[in-house]
Amino acid sequence: MSENLNILLAQTNPIVGNIDHNRDLVLDIVSKNKDADLIIFSELVLSGYPPEDLVLKSAFQNKVCDAFHEIMDASVESESYIIIGRPWKENEQLYNAAIVLHKGKVFHRHLKNTLPNYGVFDEKRIFAAGNESSLFEIKGNKIALFICEEIWDSETYKKVEGKDCDLVVTINASPFEYKKISQRENLAIELSKKINAPVIYVNQVGGQDEIVFDGSSFVADANKVLRRLPACESTSDLVTFNKTKKEFSFSEKVFDEKSEEEILYSNLVLGLKDYIEKNNFPGVVIGISGGIDSAFSACVAVDALGSDKVKGIMMPSKYTSNASVEDATLLGKNLNIEMISLSIEEAALAYESTLKNVFEGTEQDITEENIQSRIRGMLLMAYSNKFGYMVMTNGNKSEVSVGYSTLYGDMCGGFSVIKDLYKVDV
């Protein structure tokens, strides 16, 4: 028996609810990687993550089961062991599970012990918690299997301490946060020290509504990260583990290292791209004011979708400076996007005329300013309704956190790519 174990890290972009797509992702990777002894997919790759209330529907559960059995049938022709994340029903309870397939059979199953219930997570509402540690053996290699949150919980991973593991595998759907990648890596290094085995961390990649999964899968030992997969890319990597030496060897494939700022920008691009494409919008339309927020949003949109799928609309009034118009026009030219100019002057006068008797005897104030903002929102939404393009809003986190916006005005839209960036970050 060979001492080497060939392991494929499959960093994929599943779509929540599109089980056929997710099944095909898995089948395609399995069919193209026959040299792998072990293929590792991410948490709940079959359903997509987070599945939320979809996973409570029996029709959805049945569809997942059907897709799983298709993969199981296909695995008969493969020598690989395949780790798949999926919802799993057992004794009338629904679990977040990692299933190991081999030769058309369930070789091993692990039910997630630690269920996160904070921030974007609400797994305790949906899933029951498992309570067993998870160890299985492949070609003489004893492997400890974890699912995401479990490696952040010392009570869970203590269950396998002292059990002579050769390797730790954790499958994940861990959302991106600024500088979180280094937190995960440091956690894995500490876990490797405690269990005395190297760690393989496979994470989901892709946008799902307001969440972005950065991927950034890696291999680490007790001293350092040995191999990193790129952030924000669907990719895979074949690594070889030698049990006797407890060492890895890697292919000559080169992955570009990115700075923290580049990774942050890449996640903005990925989040917008997947939101538009997974929801089948033809493109986006943005109100371009000549300011930095709308300019940055437009840059992200072009990088995410291409200039042909981004429309810019300028909506000047009598208060709009020439400099703002010139800046907006230059932006459109530099990004090679179609720019449309719609004056709001006549619409503003119409509102002024309609409200003249009601407002008689009052001074102009923020009310009139907000009317202008709402006219712009109406024009953007009219374009969206007519042509199907989704309106992007341009509110940053500094503005949103203090309510600095106009209801039914600059808040109109379906997605703000900078909603989680403070003004200073923009």
Model-derived features: positions:
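Short, acidic/small-residue loops that bind anionic groups at enzyme active sites
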Residues: 64-68, 316, 415-423
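Short glycine/serine/threonine-rich phosphate/pyrophosphate-binding segments
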Residues: 294-297, 321-322, 400-401
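A glycine-rich phosphate-binding loop feature that marks nucleotide/adenosyl-phosphate handling sites
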Residues: 281-294, 347-348, 396-398
